[in-house]
Amino acid sequence: MTRYAPALRLIHWLTAALILLLFFFGGWMVYFEPKDEAFKDELYNIHQSIGVTVWVLVLIRIVVRLATGAPRLPPDAPAAVRVLATLNHLALYAVLLVQPLVGLADTNAWGFPLDWFGLFRVPWPIGKQPDDVAQRLTDMHWWGALTLLLLLAAHLAGALYHGLVRRDGVVRHMA
């Protein structure tokens, strides 16, 4: 196998685009703090809806990857590269599965529901929590975003290493 299955490639790039949007809307919400409450609520809803969408896509991606497999790294790839690639992929999957759930819990803990793109309410059992609990979830979500950003930077650095330094065809696995 020289490339990932077409469904995996599609989900990979769709997820990448959605993550960029998550950081865009998340940054806008946090750093520009819109004064218009309706606009602010819409930004939060878009960010949260995209987060839930990413979570579903990652679940689908895991199922498809288990069913279709993945191309192997070249046999001459150093052992350290193999270990780092595996750890980075596992960590990315873990964060992409946990981060949206923490975000949803964060939203709910402050007493807000999530209406997925205004189409239906996403159920969540925790409901409004004391402010200190809600703030802990907010902090966890922020640290999760920072962790995701660092993992994505490492993932991109790995892709650049394979594409520009080793020139070993690994980048074509996802192209």
Regions found by a protein language model. Name each.
Residues 1-175:
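Membrane-embedded alpha-helical bundles that constitute the cytochrome b-like, heme-associated redox core
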